[in-house]
Structures are given as structure tokens and as C-alpha cells.
UniProtKB/Swiss-Prot annotation:
GO molecular function, one term: structural constituent of ribosome
Protein's name in the database: Small ribosomal subunit protein uS9
HAMAP family associated with the record: Ribosomal_uS9_B (MF_00532_B)
PROSITE patterns per the UniProt record, alphabetical: RIBOSOMAL_S9
Alphabetical UniProt keywords: Ribonucleoprotein, Ribosomal protein
GO biological process terms on file: translation
Family as reported in the entry's similarity comment: Belongs to the universal ribosomal protein uS9 family.
Natural source organism: Pseudarthrobacter chlorophenolicus (strain ATCC 700700 / DSM 12829 / CIP 107037 / JCM 12360 / KCTC 9906 / NCIMB 13794 / A6)
Listed Low complexity bias regions: 1-11
Recorded GO CC terms: cytoplasm; small ribosomal subunit
Region feature Disordered, mapped onto this chain: 1-36
InterPro entries named in the record: Ribosomal_Su5_D2-typ_SF, Ribosomal_uS9, Ribosomal_uS9_bac/plastid, Ribosomal_uS9_CS, Ribsml_uS5_D2-typ_fold_subgr
A Pfam family per the record: Ribosomal_S9
Amino acid sequence: MAQNEELTTEAVEAEENPTSYTSESSAAEAAPKKERPALTVAGAAVGRRKEAVARVRVVPGSGKWTINGRALDNYFPNKLHQQDVNEPFKILDLEGAYDVIARIHGGGISGQAGALRLGIARSLNEIDVENNRATLKKAGYLSRDARVIERKKAGLKKARKAQQYSKR
């Protein structure tokens, strides 16, 4: 019994006074990463940006995109919009894990891409709040971009553009 007590006291002292110091933390000290549940749950959400509204369903699959019945590269030929839409999957390391089915209407191409990204982020958040929410929120993908076109004012050519003024 006394020998067991000596071993435990030595183990405790060894933990308190390490023999070597490093600037890197060990794998055991790193923040515990929660296990992701099996990819069997689907999620659905709505995303909006400017005048565009996207109704998005994210279903476990092979990474197939269907937007208004068309493929991603067909609907958004601009690579920048394709990357923008795919960002929530990239940041969560879930590329190719889910199929995306979306119906988008209203607005222009940029607004539709932003609406789709928000809808995807919200549906991924719905699927697994514990693991996904903090990452998506930190990246800013769960926030709705409230910027909209400013209305035209009476007596002006546009929202703020007035006729040229001549002092003399």
C-alpha cells in the first residue's frame, strides 16, 4: 500500500514539474475535437441578400449541386461566385459530403450567390450546431448582409447624385 502511494505521489510531482519544456502543446493538451455525427441528417434553410432569396436543402451525398435545375458551374459561370458559395463547406472540411438543392429567385448574380452561401451555412448549422456553429459564426457566414440599394430621392438624379451646381 505504501509503495502505491509513493508511485502516485511521484506521478503527481512529475506532472507538476516536467523535465523538459517546449513551446508547443502536446496532442493531449489540444482542445478536444468533438466527433461529428454520421452524415445522415439533412438540413434546410433560407438565405437572403439584396433582393435575392435562396431556399436551400443540404442532403448527405456526393457533392452534387442543383440550382434551379442546373449545375453549379452552369448557373454561376464566374469562378469567384462558385468559390463564394462553396466556402461554408471548405471551412468545415465537408467538401463533397453533401448534395445541395436550391431554388433561387430575385436579384442579380452576386446577390443570389450571397443568398445561397447564407442558406448553405444556415442549413449546415442546423445539421450539427455543436460542431459547426462556432466555426461558421467566426467566419461570418451566419450573418445576413443587410446592405440594400438606397432609394432614389426626389429632385436628385439617383440616390445621392444631384445636378451640377454653378455658383456664378
